[in-house]
Amino acid sequence: MPFSLGQRWISDTESELGLGTVVGMEGRMVTVLFSATGENRLFSRSEAPLTRVIFNPGDKVESHDEWSLTVTEVEEKDNLIIYHGIHSETGEQASLRETLLNHNIRFNKPQDRLFAGQIDRMDRFGVRYQCQLLRNKLATSDLLGLQGPRVGLIPHQQWIAHEVGQRFAPRVLLADEVGLGKTIEAGLIIHQQLLTGRAERILVIVPDTLRHQWLVEMLRRFNLRFSVFDEDRCVEAYADNDNPFYTEQLVICSLELLRKKKRLEQALDADWDLMVVDEAHHLEWSEDAPSRAYKVVEALSEVVPGVLLLTATPDQLGHQSHFARLRLLDPDRFYDYPSFLKEEESYKDVATAADALACGESLSSEAIASLTQLLSEKDISDSINLIQDASANADKRNQAREELLQELLDRHGTGRVLYRNSRASVKGFPTRNLHIHPQPMPEQYVTASRVSAMMNKHLDTNAKVRQVLSPEKIYQDFDSGSASWWKFDPRVDWLIDFLKTNRSKKVLIIASQAETALSLEEALRTREGIQATVFHEGMSIIERDKAGAYFAQETGGAQALICSEIGSEGRNFQFASHLVLFDLPLNPDLLEQRIGRLDRIGQKNDVEIHLPYLAGTAQERLMQWYHQGLNAFECTCPSGHILFGEFSGELLETLTTDDESSLETLLDNTKSRYQELKVAMEQGRDKLLEINSHGGERANKLVESLAARDEDTQLIGSVIRLWDIIGVEQEDSGENAIVLHPSEHMMFPTYPGLPEDGITVTFDRDMALSRDDIALITQEHPIVQTGLDLITSSETGTTSVAVLKNKALPAGTVFLELIYMADASAPKSSQLYRYLPPTPIRILLDKSGNNLSDNVTYESFDRQLSAVNRHIASKLVTASQAILHPLFAKGETFAANELKLLTETAREKMTQQLTGELERLKALKAVNPNIRDEELTHLSEQMSELNRYLDSSQLQLDAIRLVLVSHA
């Protein structure tokens, strides 16, 4: 290389050093000073990884005195370059020697990097282009926010999330029956609101005992890092902000914290976009005396735009409490309880008409008259005639039914604010089978219980019941906690025999106390060497994950997982179908929670419930009350909460005595009341509301679309290639899983979201659902998003040179492939990306400036190309400069025309969609007051705002590939 003192060069391997100056030459070595960092580097003159920097006419260069020159002429004198052109400050002719160029010059623009010899490997150009295409594909997805979460594709859950998550500031009540996944629905809505920019700051209010469960659920299922706030955390946060709630965007806290006046005031002032309240049915309300908890949530609901209330079904707790929750969502709409009851009467006509449509049979004359009256502002005679015509096309008849059902729903008083699914309306649940295993009461327990009864006569009934339900605890307490009760307890003998007989089965065992769970694990291990693991509240999240993963492993994993009551909250193990209840909780809801660990949508087998109990004891009497009175083992019992409240006094008394007649009376009374409540709930079912809540055929199609995207092999290939380019270590761990590790050779110093100790990932949803320790990789996963951002926000792949070996073309023929990005700067919350996301525009020019991109696809062109080394690539660029400069100008003209078309299409799509939605909501508002004025105003303002953003759309050259034909 011909070096001279004062010449400016740039490092090919360390561009961050800036512009270097040749300051010394001695023998075969050259010294270059990089003034930006103050570093001297010594290079071999023959193999220096340096590129000479020479600008061209039209370029703008900056002097070290910080004035700039627009170059009109380039002169070389004594091996040094002198630039002539227009002075930026005076507007007059000026000259600038290359020695006086600003040493902080960076070559960020692709064409500058190309001419400066900073040329990337060819595969990086391809990865960059694919990254831009993936970002565009995600932004334009109509399912944005639904694919990424690690949840099963359950139609009613996805439907509710799709319907609610797309709204501006949604205010809804999620009131599904237990086991149908309200938490998942809320998580999907939160995830969708965050990804679409509709919400940024979210507050989740939960009972104290559920804070940890929500934290785990949001992280493991939705990749959302919430922070749990308690009083200690609030005090710590003062160092960063006077209002502790401003220190995090995503916060989980308990109602107890917000009962404090100071904390409530801070929460009210924290500018939340969305508030989620779990267990909202515990907010007590009456017109005269609302509870403190209710007032706290009410105050927040007045200042937070979006509100999600998760609650028990309205049937469970009565209409007044149901009205109280609706009042939190829209106090102007639900202002008076008597008026609400009166309005509800009118819903019955709508629901009856919906039943007639939903059953799929011909309509009676009464149903036709009712439908005609309810939809009097429309002529529905054609639809009615089509439904009644048995010879008509079945699909068309069903479509007519769907359309009329939708019309009815729009008139339903709470159709847009209340979602409630019941097991009666949702398919996919397994059968529950109870197997009882009575065991004799050991003499050791009889003696311990007799002594305890004499010593603890002062105990209240609740304490006595807790004791008689857990005789092993009484026995252990008498021996300072060191007694090995499991050596003689017949329930343990039965459990060991059961596990030995069913060695191929996964078995979940639940006990009330962590101590009991630990003792059982010791018994199984020491007596028979049975592989079991424990799961209790004293373990960390990571320890619980490892225990869950060990249990989930098909080969070499634990046969049994032994859980405590609290430790199992929020964890589901659908891959197992055998449940052993080592004892019973004194609460129907807790019993349902236990069974619900296995009895969930997605369970592929019947749930076999095994109950070993001590015969003739309180355990047997409690089992009888649950089984004969509530049928709580083999069916869900929505009225369990009410029945326990009504009969708890008699039940507790019965458990502490041996009075058979009082037990029979209790069972008869409970059974009778259970049937009454069951009939009342069935009659109170609102079929129209259920149709809206589970989505019907529309929900099934939504899930089919999501499932199809899970099978996108092109995405899998693109993501793995992305990790290859970045330098992430990938190790196949079998079972469709890959272990990712940061490597020493990564292109970037850090990869946010990729742990130092690695992460196990899979593209298989079923695998991810069965293993808590494996992340589900979709295009929405933060690791993928971060990878895309690392590439597209850096200079990686912005320049490339390749050779096309094709003897049908003259040697030396030049092609210039340009990737432009069409974009418009706008906040995420504007939703502009739905119409004009960052869009790559590919232009392929021949040397005459003809655009060949329509005829030559990227894939077919890329397959024919071969890479060249950087040294040769730099020479090819230098030799082609005269051809390239005019081609860049032509490329921009073609891209500008494409941008114009994209903008016009985006504007048409936006206007059509938003105008249609605005007109629909205005029409609905005339018949359904649940359409809020805020929604209409927001749509009108959004249209004006989006038009302004579209007017400012612009082009940016993102990447260049120079291709030359070779016959070699």
Curated annotation (Swiss-Prot):
GO terms for biological process: regulation of DNA-templated transcription. Residues 491-678 form the Helicase C-terminal domain. InterPro entries: Helicase_ATP-bd, Helicase_C-like, Helicase_RapA, P-loop_NTPase, RapA_C, SNF2-like_sf, SNF2/RAD54-like_C, SNF2_N. Residues 163-332 form the Helicase ATP-binding domain. Its EC number is 3.6.4.-. Keywords: Activator, ATP-binding, DNA-binding, Helicase, Hydrolase, Nucleotide-binding, Transcription, Transcription regulation. Transcription regulator that activates transcription by stimulating RNA polymerase (RNAP) recycling in case of stress conditions such as supercoiled DNA or high salt concentrations. Probably acts by releasing the RNAP, when it is trapped or immobilized on tightly supercoiled DNA. Does not activate transcription on linear DNA. Probably not involved in DNA repair. Interacts with the RNAP. Has a higher affinity for the core RNAP than for the holoenzyme. Its ATPase activity is stimulated by binding to RNAP. This is RNA polymerase-associated protein RapA. The lineage of its organism: Bacteria, Pseudomonadati, Pseudomonadota, Gammaproteobacteria, Alteromonadales.
